[in-house]
Amino acid sequence: MGPFGARASPEAGQVVKQPLTDDPQESLAQGESERLPPRFATYFHIHLVSDSTGETLNAMARAVCARFTDILPIEHIYALVRSTRQLDRALEEIAGAPGVVMHTIVDPGLRAALEEGCRKLEMPCIAALDPVISAMSRYLGARISTRVGAQHALTNDYFDRIEALDYAIAHDDGQGGQDLTQADVILVGVSRTSKTPTCIYLAHRGVRAANVPLVPGRPPPPELFELKNTLIVGLITSPDRLIQIRRNRLLSLKENRESDYVDADAVRQEIIAARRLFERQNWPVIDITRRSVEETAAAVINLLSGGRGKVEVLG
């Protein structure tokens, strides 16, 4: 591993096709364990050079690479590259593992040096944000800022996200019911319907999100039904998917005994009861069966931005 924390990879400079293990945790580059890879995949090196945290560049690279089937990237991340010395070290590592270079370098001198270095190495050098920034500049008729890491400035939005995160943690799993009126949205659903991760993701977007579990034999907190101006969203999923998730949860806890928690009939009754509650209260419903946490959060944000009528967002 180099000084910038490059990912583990095949031998430097190679684009290889190799059999993958049966364990998806081991076989996916970057630890993407949510989808099974093809039995054979092509690996390639992608170098991400940033003068800031690298988060924007990393997200863009992953989004682009996801569009190619059977091709898995080996990421090499070079963050906080703000001097010629740091750039030279990055170029040394890039030379040892030929591939694609993407960057979000702002400083003109460093950009030129990186592009020249890649030209000598005969590697593509992509300024990831340039097309979008140029188009925005032309449309707005505004000059482009050269301030490094401008998106990470300590603005009011930053502190709003911190407060939203604190709120989500304090109001997870039905806690803090006394001040649910402070929530922008409350997610309601049976156990293992991604309520907590969705709330955390929403918090990173500055949304104050609480969640309330629906537990068989236990009525929801009465405060939930007294709210007038807070968006409440019901989360549901298919019985088969819910049983699978719950069984995996029990296995992780080394709990093997059968119970209503994973009983097919009991799970179906839980979901039916949840649906009936949502219908009675006229709460919008999101089916998370085929949705990632990010997609569920996006659907919630759409509901926050638009109407709050009786809507069901299908998976």
Curated annotation (Swiss-Prot):
Residues 1-32 are annotated as: Disordered. It catalyses: N(tele)-phospho-L-histidyl/L-threonyl-[pyruvate, phosphate dikinase] + ADP = N(tele)-phospho-L-histidyl/O-phospho-L-threonyl-[pyruvate, phosphate dikinase] + AMP + H(+); N(tele)-phospho-L-histidyl/O-phospho-L-threonyl-[pyruvate, phosphate dikinase] + phosphate + H(+) = N(tele)-phospho-L-histidyl/L-threonyl-[pyruvate, phosphate dikinase] + diphosphate. InterPro entries: Kinase-pyrophosphorylase (IPR005177), PPDK_reg (IPR026565). Its EC number is 2.7.11.32, 2.7.4.27. Keywords: Kinase, Nucleotide-binding, Serine/threonine-protein kinase, Transferase. It comes from the Bacteria. The keyword Kinase applies. The keyword Nucleotide-binding applies. ADP binds at residues 189-196. It is an enzyme of class 2 (transferase). GO terms for molecular function: ADP binding; ATP binding; phosphotransferase activity, phosphate group as acceptor; protein serine/threonine kinase activity. HAMAP family: PDRP. Belongs to the pyruvate, phosphate/water dikinase regulatory protein family. PDRP subfamily. Bifunctional serine/threonine kinase and phosphorylase involved in the regulation of the pyruvate, phosphate dikinase (PPDK) by catalyzing its phosphorylation/dephosphorylation. NCBIfam families: PRK05339.1 (NF003742). This is Putative pyruvate, phosphate dikinase regulatory protein. It comes from Caulobacter vibrioides (strain ATCC 19089 / CIP 103742 / CB 15) (Caulobacter crescentus). The lineage of its organism: Bacteria, Pseudomonadati, Pseudomonadota, Alphaproteobacteria, Caulobacterales.
